[in-house]
Regions:
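Substrate-binding groove of N-acetylhexosamine-processing glycoside hydrolases
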Residues: 1-240
Length: 240
C-alpha cells in the first residue's frame, strides 16, 4: 500500500484496538448476539400465546455443525451467578462501555473507508476487506446494544403502572425492531463481499445472507406482529 493509504489503515486498526478495551461479553452475550452477530433474533418477551410454550426459538444451523444451535440462546435474558452484579444493574454500565466501543469503531471505519479511496488498484480489495470486517463487527456491536435495551424495555413495559406508560415502552421496543431490521440489511452486502464473515468452525455459517434474511423475517413476522397484538391488549384496558 502507498504511504497515504498505510496511515489510514494503521489508524483504523488503532481505533479498533482501542475500541476492544470497552468490549464486554457476559454469558448471555457470548451465547447470544456476540456469537451470531446481526443475525441474532429479537423475541418479544411477553407470552401472549395460548400454548404457554417456551418463547425461545431454535437458531437454524447446519445439521452437521459440531455445536450448531446448541450454543446459541435466542431468548435474551441475564444469566446470573453469585459472583457478578445482577443484569438489571450491570446493563446500564455495559451499555455505556459498549457505546465507547462503538464510537472508537466508527472512527476506525471512517479511516478504513479513506484507505479504500486512496489504495492502489491492486490493493483495493484488501482495503475493502478491512472495512467489511470492521463494519461487520460494528453492526454486531449495535445488535448487542439493541438487545440489552430490548430486554430493559420489555421489563419496564411489563412493570408499568399504567397502560400509557406501557405503550410508551412499546413504542421504543417497536423502534428497536425496525432498527434491527435495517442493521441486518446493512450487514448483508458485507457477508456477500467476504464469505469468511459470519462463519465459525463449531457452528458453520450463522451470519451469512440466509441467516440475516431469516432474522429479518423473524422480526417482521414474529416480533412486530406480537407488538401490534400487545398494543391492542393495552387499548382494551384503556377502553375499560
Amino acid at each position: 500500500m502507498n504511504t497515504r493509504c498505510r496511515s489510514h489503515v494503521l489508524k483504523a486498526w488503532k481505533c479498533f484496538s482501542e475500541g476492544m478495551n470497552y468490549y464486554i461479553a457476559s454469558n448471555e452475550d457470548q451465547y447470544g448476539p456476540w456469537r451470531v452477530g446481526a443475525a441474532y433474533p429479537f423475541i418479544f418477551q411477553p407470552n401472549i400465546s395460548r400454548t404457554m410454550s417456551d418463547k425461545a426459538i431454535k437458531f437454524p444451523t447446519a445439521p452437521h455443525a459440531h455445536f450448531g444451535y446448541k450454543i446459541v440462546k435466542t431468548f435474551y435474558t441475564p444469566y446470573e451467578n453469585a459472583e457478578q452484579t445482577p443484569g438489571f444493574l450491570r446493563y446500564p454500565a455495559e451499555l455505556r462501555s459498549l457505546q465507547k466501543m462503538l464510537e472508537h469503531w466508527n472512527k476506525g471505519l471512517a479511516a478504513a473507508e479513506k484507505a479504500i479511496e486512496c489504495a492502489d488498484e491492486k490493493k483495493k480489495d484488501e482495503a475493502r476487506r478491512l472495512e467489511a470486517l470492521g463494519h461487520f463487527i460494528r453492526n454486531s456491536t449495535i445488535t448487542v446494544m439493541n438487545i440489552k435495551k430490548w430486554w430493559q424495555l420489555n421489563m419496564a413495559m411489563q412493570n408499568s403502572a399504567t397502560a400509557e406508560e406501557a405503550e410508551a415502552c412499546l413504542d421504543k421496543i417497536e423502534a428497536l425492531a425496525y432498527a434491527e431490521i435495517e442493521n441486518a440489511k446493512d450487514t448483508i452486502p458485507l457477508v456477500e463481499f467476504d464469505s469468511r464473515l459470519g462463519w465459525e468452525p463449531s457452528m458453520e455459517y450463522v451470519c451469512d445472507k440466509w441467516h440475516l434474511e431469516w432474522k429479518i423475517r423473524q422480526v417482521t413476522d414474529g416480533a412486530l406482529r406480537e407488538i401490534a397484538a400487545y398494543r391492542k391488549m393495552l387499548n382494551l384496558h384503556k377502553q375499560d
